[in-house]
Amino acid sequence: MKKNPSGVFSKTPVSCMQETVLRQLVRIAGLHEMTIWRNRKHEWHLSVTVTQRSQVVYLSTRRAPRVPRAFTRLEAALAAGQRVSSTRQVTLVLR
């Protein structure tokens, strides 16, 4: 969060893309890293780093394309990641 001159906190801008657009970006630019992480509300989020960009891109919802999509189950987040990266086999690294 960033603090504005007026003293009010604002959320940092997040780069989000819908699944179809993100799939095309990964296909063209190449996948560097895909991360599934959990926040304090126990929601899972999917983020992708593309090889030609150093920016992290989050999977967005269909109805609100600028909001990161929150998954309630890890299996659903993994399935969405497999659809984005067009792979069947995924290696999990737990931290």
Predicted regions located by residue number:
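Generic low-complexity, intrinsically disordered sequence content enriched
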Residues: 26-29, 63, 78
